[in-house]
Amino acid sequence: MCRKSIKKKLAPRFADAQAGKRAVFFVDAAHFVFGAFLGYLWCFARCWIKAPSGRQRFNVLGALHSITHEVITVTNFTYINAESVCQLLRKLGALGLQVPITLVLDNARYQRCALVQSIADTLGIELLYLPAYSPNLNFIERLWKFVKKQCLYSKYYTDFGAFTHAIEDCLMHTQTIHKHALCSLLTLNFLSFRKAQSLTT
């Protein structure tokens, strides 16, 4: 599906969402590595910092509501697969919303499999897949960037538990503590770039 086609499909669904006639969620997985995330550092002298090994990972499969910015998550410490997506679908179905639900998600194989599509059909949830290589069209990518900035950059956590708690706490407060900061970031506008020649010297 081309970008022009997906935008034509998204536009009426956004209009319904803003009118309260539909719930549109953007879905994506983020893999937070328990390692060093430096901000900006430059100096003549060598500088040693405390840093975790980077061998542990906190996986978050999230669904971000396009209007309220509520985040529904499924988390684990192994990997995200089709069963994780099915768990998320069941969580969304359990919300008991009185309007149709549309999920906007990328073309990851585990999100397009027969199991996921069967569960979505059973729950009456529409799956709207984005074209390949178009993270700019996935609203939730902006949230992941915000979470990394808030919780990871230039931060050191003594243990993995504190690391995961910081991420969960940030996601829990998208509608409260972080509401003002996210207000301008999570707006329903998208960037797309035409093909352009790269200039080299």
Name each model-derived stretch.
Residues 1-201:
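Short functional hotspots at interaction and active-site rims
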